[in-house]
UniProtKB/Swiss-Prot annotation:
Keywords: Ribonucleoprotein, Ribosomal protein. Belongs to the universal ribosomal protein uL15 family. Pfam families: Ribosomal_L27A. Residues 1-42 are annotated as: Disordered. This is Large ribosomal subunit protein uL15. The keyword Ribosomal protein applies. It comes from the Eukaryota. One of its GO terms (cellular component) is cytosolic large ribosomal subunit. HAMAP family: Ribosomal_uL15 (MF_01341). GO terms for biological process: translation. One of its GO terms (molecular function) is RNA binding. Residues 1-14, 21-30 have a biased composition (Basic residues).
């Protein structure tokens, strides 16, 4: 049957309330904080936090990050890099002498991928890498692909 008494109330009148005579429910029997993860709390760590301790894999000495820096941009996002008012002017322009030049390195991209469509408007795109598909679509639109270091 449910009772209105909490469990602590049941211990009243029994001196140490279930916490012993010597220790008296003091101090830190399991250590402080996260102590003992590799020792007396190991079963808990192994069960609930597998892989918390230890290392995996190999280290890469003298790694030069710029060899692996290759942020990509799809063709469908290429025109969004041009400010809106200039974009409208380029797309509606009939003057073939004025074409946009998009240099991707200062914008934080190094490779152009071929996903998506671009309008049949010539443009110059400068980047370190181009996929074959991206290069094909840009040149078909009348544009130029420029590789930069």
């Amino acid at each position: 049957m449910p009772t209105h008494l909490s469990k602590t109330r049941k211990h009243r009148g029994h001196v140490s309330a279930g916490h012993g005579r010597v220790g008296k429910h003091r101090k830190h029997p399991g250590g402080r904080g996260l102590a003992g993860g590799q020792h007396h709390h190991r079963t808990n760590m192994d069960k609930y936090h597998p892989g918390y301790f230890g290392k995996v894999g190999m280290r890469y000495f003298h790694k030069q990050g710029n060899h692996f820096w290759k942020p990509v941009l799809n063709l469908e996002k290429l025109w969004s890099l041009i400010p809106a008012e200039k974009r409208e002017a380029y797309l509606s322009s009939t003057n073939p002498d004025v074409i946009p030049v998009i240099d991707l390195l200062p914008l934080g991209y190094s490779k152009v991928l071929g996903k998506g469509r671009i309008p049949k408007v010539p443009l110059v795109v400068r980047a370190r890498w181009f996929s074959k598909e991206a290069e094909r679509k840009i040149t078909e639109a009348g544009g130029v692909v420029e590789l930069v270091a």
